[in-house]
């Protein structure tokens, strides 16, 4: 049954700095059907911008977000949510191909590392 399933979008829930994203993910075990994952960088409490996916480039611990998804046995699709325009790309704002591709590779790398370290 897919009633009351949801898409977790960390960049939406993460705009409230009081939200513990990994904890929220764990509390929604079995209800998350799709995950949009990206990083944000806070400039102040209410001012933020989308950042590259790497944890060091923003305010979210991307490893902990992906680990929370892994820990709950998430098997749905995970995609990078939005992308910056980089390397001179001209595209629809927010949907830069290169940054989304880098994000997808990074998220896959995190997942593989978590999976391999959990198998020990």
Residue ranges and their predicted role:
Residues 77-84:
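Short acidic/histidine-rich active-site segments
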């Amino acid at each position: 049954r897919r009633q009351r399933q949801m898409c977790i979008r960390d960049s939406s829930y993460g705009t409230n700095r009081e939200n513990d994203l990994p904890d929220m993910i764990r509390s929604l075990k079995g209800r998350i059907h799709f995950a949009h994952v990206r990083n944000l960088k806070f400039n102040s409490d209410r001012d933020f911008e989308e950042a590259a996916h790497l944890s060091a480039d923003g305010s979210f611990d991307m490893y902990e977000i992906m680990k929370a998804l892994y820990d709950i046995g998430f098997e749905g699709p995970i995609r990078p949510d939005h992308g910056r325009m980089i390397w001179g790309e001209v595209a629809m704002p927010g949907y830069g191909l290169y940054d989304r591709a880098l994000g997808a590779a990074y998220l896959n790398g995190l997942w593989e590392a978590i999976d391999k370290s959990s198998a020990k």
